[in-house]
Amino acid sequence: MAHREKASHLGPFKPTLILHGGAGALSRANLPSELWTRYHASLSRYLAVTRELLNSGSTALDAACHAVALLEDDVLYNCGRGSVFTERGTIEMEASVMVCSVDPGGPPAGSIKRGAAVSLIRNTRHPILLAKEVLVTADEDGGMGGTSTMHCHLSGRDVEEWGWAEKALEKKPDHWFWTQRRWEEHRRGLHQQSSYNFADLIASVDPLSEQLHQEDDGLDGVREIPSQGTVGAVCMDSWGNLAVATSTGGLTNKKAGRIGDTPTAGSGFWAESWDEDTYNNRAPFRSTQGAQPPLVTLVGRMPVLYQLVTQTSNLLGSCLSPTESDEEHQQYRAEAPAPAYTAYKSPPLLPRYDTSTQQPIRHRRHALAMSGTGNGDSFIRVNACRTVASICRLDYPSPPLAEAMRVIAGPKGELQRSAGDRWGKTGEGQGGMIGIEVIDEQEPDVECGVDSKGETKSKKKTGRVAFDFNCGGLFRAYYEVDEKTGTEEPKVMVFKEEY
C-alpha cells in the first residue's frame, strides 16, 4: 500500500540520468586495470544510488546534486576532496547547476534564476550544494527580494561564509582537501618533486595529523590518477524536469584566481527548454520564388518569429497584427498553462494549420541539459554547451542532441578545431560532453493502450541520453535502452569501446 501511494506521486516520464567523471588523454597505458576497476565500481554505485532517488520521486535537481556530492567526496575525481592544486599550492574549486523542464510552468525549484555557479571555493566540503543554494535563494520571495538575491555567479570567501552561516553547509579545513597523489602531481608539474613532499606539507599544518599515515586506498602501484576528473550529472525526473550539476578543482597548476568553464554558463554547462512546431518534415525556412508571402505565412513557417509575434500581440493587442483580424489570430494563440508542478499535463493540442498547405501543425515542448569536461578554456572560447543547444533549437528539423554534440565535442568538431595546430600538443581542445534530451509531443488519436479493466493506460514518456568526446576517453555511466524491448542496462565506460 505504501509503495502504491509513493508511486501515485510520480509523473508521466520515466526517470533517467547520465554521469561523467572527466575526459582527456586517457589510454590503457595511463589507466591500468586496477585503477579502472576502482572507477567502474564507484561510477556504478553512484549511478544506481541516484537512479533509486529518481525512482522514488526525487526531483532532478536534488538527484543531480546528490550524485555530484558523492563524487566530490571521492578522491578519484578532480573535485571536492580530490581537487588538484594551483601553481601556488592552494585549492580553488568551482561548481554549477542549471534546470529546465518540458512543463511550461518550469521546474519546482530554481526556475527563476535557471542557473547558478560558485567559484574560488576553498573550504566548503560540497561546492555543488553551495551552487544549489545560490540557485534557489530567489525562489523564497519569487525573485522580488532585491538585486543581491538574483546574482547567478558568486565567488570567494563571502559566498562560502553565507553558505556556512545561513545554509548550514559543511566547512572543512584546507588540509582536508589535500591528497598525496594530487600534491605529487602538482610538484612534478613545477619540476620540484623532492624539495617539499606531502609529509612536509601536512606537518606544516598539523604534525600529528592522521594524514601523515595515509590509509590504504587500494591503489598500490598506481603512481598517479588522471587529473581530467571534472564531474557532472544530468538527471531527468518523473515530471520531465531536467537538471545539470557540475563540479571541478580546475586545471593542475592553474593560475590562482583562474575561472574555468564549469561555472561559466553556456560553456561548461547548460539547460534549456522551448516550444516548437513540427511541420510534417517540411522545412519552414525554404526560400520562395516570386512575391513575398504575407506576414501570417512567414509566422506559420518560422517558429521563432511566430513566438515573438504572438507573445507581443498577447501583451499589446491585435493592433500589432495588421495582416489578420483578432478572430483570425485566435488559431495561433495558446493560453498560458497554469504553473502547477504536481498537476502537470502535456501541452494542449490546439487545432492550428500551415496556411500554405493547410496541413496541421503539431506543437511540442523540447528540453535538454548538458555538462562538459575537458580543457575548460577551450569550452569557453566556443561557448560549447550553449552552442550545442542552439543547433538543436534553431536548426530545422531539430537534430538529435547526439548529432549536435558531435559537431562541437566529437572528433574534428569545433572544440578540436579551436586548438588549431596546437591540437595534440598542449591538451587544448580536448574534452567531452554528456546530456539528456526530452521531447514532449502530443499527437491526435494516439492509442495508449487499455488495461485488463478496460481503462486507458498511458505509456511512460522517455528521454534520451547523449555523449561524445574527441580525446582518448570519457568516464561515463548511464542507462542504455534497447530500442526494441525498452529494457535498460547500466553502462560504465571510458573509451569508445569496452575496456
Feature locations, PLM:
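Alpha/propeptide regions of enzymes that mature by internal proteolysis
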Residues: 1-499
